């Protein structure tokens, strides 16, 4: 499969700490990849670099072979139209003084996407399981799970090819978490959207992703299809992560 989003040899240091050390990742159209690892292994650093929100000390991130560097809104517009993100905390990701419809339409205006923005917002609200008239309401009128649906609608507004999300469901309770994971899976399948998801919840990974990449101390120590890696972990870190989730079967069943 040819790569849509491809990172090659990413290294990121913070002072004497090497957060990421020569990491390469590729994501094909429609593919769903998880990044897992213990706390401090470099997952969020990798997500930020893949979103061109941070500059690597070495390595490149490219979309369809075109390299991207963090920079002005104008210089990265082409990239942001196609690579979007969903925030970790839906509670904080909306301006309380902006109606939901305007918030969902915000990327369309910022990224100068042409067309009828109100119609697109109504379509998106329905796609994420909300009523079209939600557009007139305020963020505080929605539950955490509904706000995460709104955040997904906002991310999908410019019709991206890739969603990179760092712990997109960790702020939600278990039942709502599974509903939002289901929504992401369904949208990814329907729109051919590629997903790269950082998650400490291996149940979420198993439910949502095709392939998993295990990070340890900034390096990829294991990767492969989720079933194979979780079924027969080859690296002690993977085994430790799995051991820490005794209720995995219960979470995903
Ligand atoms: N802005 C920063 N300044 C200094 N050190 C940082 C910074 N961001 C990350 N680090 C360090 O880089 C390493 C990787 O951090 P990162 O947040 O990517 O890990 P993570 O796997 O996402 O962790 P967690 O699961 O706890 O969120 C850690 O040692 C962290 O302390």
For the regions a protein language model found, what residue spans apply to each?
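ABC ATPase NBD coupling module
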Residues: 68-84, 98, 102, 110, ...
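Conserved ABC transporter NBD signature motif
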Residues: 59-70
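ABC ATPase "signature
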Residues: 223-224
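Conserved ABC ATPase signature
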Residues: 138-142, 146
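Helix-to-loop junction immediately C-terminal to a conserved catalytic motif
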Residues: 51
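Conserved ABC ATPase "signature" region
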Residues: 116-133, 242-243
